[in-house]
Amino acid sequence: MSVSAVELASLAAGPDAVRRLGARRGFLGETPANRELARILRDRPETFGSVHSLVLGADEVHVPDLAASRGFAPSLQVFGLECIDGFQRLRILSDALAGLGAEHLEKATVRLEIHCGRYRDVARSLHDAGHRLVNATTAQDGLIRCPNVRWLMAGDWEKEGFFDPRRGVSAGPHRRCFSMPEVTRGLACLSLAPGPEALHLATTDEGIERLWGAVGSELYLGVFRDRMSPLGVVRAVEAYDSARAALRNLPGRLKKGAGHLIDYAPDLICWKACRRLLPLEDLHVEAGSRHDWGGMIEDQLPAVTARTAEDLVRRYEAVHRARGDGPHYKGEAELLDVWREVLG
């Protein structure tokens, strides 16, 4: 059932509310989720109850005589109330009643479930284990709402393969499936942004999630620009793969000392090499491109990458010596500040 938020706001009032309602935990305060719920209630109260239900248990529920009330039950009498799930929302409603007033809360409704008898035990058991029954949302799940990504999805992929940013989507009978991580790293490597910050984030799973979660930010839009094309994505992925392969093929003697940069910060070298050779501003130009992208990526980029590696290793040697961090290269070479110093 849907209930006016103002009718529920007083349930969590008072310092003893969590004990009185038998909730699993007290009010958690300024958590990100609670701040967002409070913001929605303040700015868009009509949408507050759109997600999730408030789940209560009760010893008894008395329903008024429907005949006397012409088919409508204006109120319920609930005895032995328990908050099975939703105490944070109840407390947010209680605080909003004091801060925003009853008139504001009347704009919000809450979906309410009340369970009695054995159904109460079942509901309690399910909600106690609720975290094990829900697949956690990740930043990647929000990419489907990005207009630039949706534009890219709507492009003509028939010749190029298959692309979908969502987790758990199979490629089907397509020639090539481009995963969201490889698309992100390719586009970050060939981004028009002046620095390698986006690609540095994309080098780790945690970093790439942070990048995906920053939809609309300058860093994000430097990677996922407007009007991207399937062919541009293919070029970016192939260029990134070509540069990485060129580094793997370098002889081991070049990867000693400061040459550890090749193993510990390969994306820095790829980023710089692509800038030295490729016309990044034309990445997503499909018809009538002035450039032989295939030839540049296959025939020229490996050699440019090798020369770039030699240049950046020499620069890193000076940076490493100036930092005085001893013989350990791995942790140092992975730092964004070191990348910036090496690039000068």
Identify the function of each model-found stretch.
Residues 1-48, 73, 81, 268, ...:
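N-terminal extension/subdomain marker
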Residues 56-57, 83-87, 115-116:
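Short His-Asn-centered micro-motif
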Residues 67-77, 274:
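A short acidic-Thr-Gly-centered motif at the start of a beta-strand
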Residues 38, 42, 106-108, 112-280:
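C-terminal catalytic or substrate-handling cores of phosphate/nucleotide-
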